[in-house]
């Protein structure tokens, strides 16, 4: 995994943290022939990591800043098997052929999951922070007939203080994996 500090960053554009990227990549169960759609690509951390392990990545974000940040990171890490599109996922999904999906953030998630179901996508991994969104997504996957697995990952970083060491927690992330039955 590439360390977070190595990525180009822009204020207001999120990045999936290194440890969360590692678990999410594992949940995608990537194969060198996979073509992956990255919805809500943010800073492009997942797009860069996925591109190293798959045939091609289509990245989507509805933020111009996110698109530009992702493009900067693709260039920085010499990624040539990824394109970045600006727009809403529900409008762009039909333009691409892919077999796996990573969703790091998006609006209209239920509509997007319905569109992905119509395309018979074999594996979808969704990262969420808000508990209500996690429940909504799990319920939608079950309604659509997917096998669903979910794990909540908490990461704490060590910090030295005068009297010893402490662990500083980051927000826990729920990683939801859906596979076709």
Swiss-Prot record:
UniProt xrefs under InterPro entries: CbiT, Cbl_synth_MTase_CbiT, Cobalamin_biosynth_MTase, Methyltranfer_dom, SAM-dependent_MTases_sf
Keywords: Cobalamin biosynthesis, Methyltransferase, S-adenosyl-L-methionine, Transferase
GO biological process, one term: methylation
PANTHER family given in the database record: COBALT-PRECORRIN-6B C(15)-METHYLTRANSFERASE (DECARBOXYLATING) (PTHR43182), COBALT-PRECORRIN-7 C(5)-METHYLTRANSFERASE (PTHR43182:SF1)
NCBIfam families noted in UniProt: CbiT
Entry similarity comment: Belongs to the methyltransferase superfamily. Archaeal-type CbiT family.
Protein's recorded name: Probable cobalt-precorrin-6B C(15)-methyltransferase (decarboxylating)
Source organism per UniProt: Methanococcus maripaludis (strain DSM 14266 / JCM 13030 / NBRC 101832 / S2 / LL)
Highest classification ranks of the organism: Archaea, Methanobacteriati, Methanobacteriota, Methanomada group, Methanococci
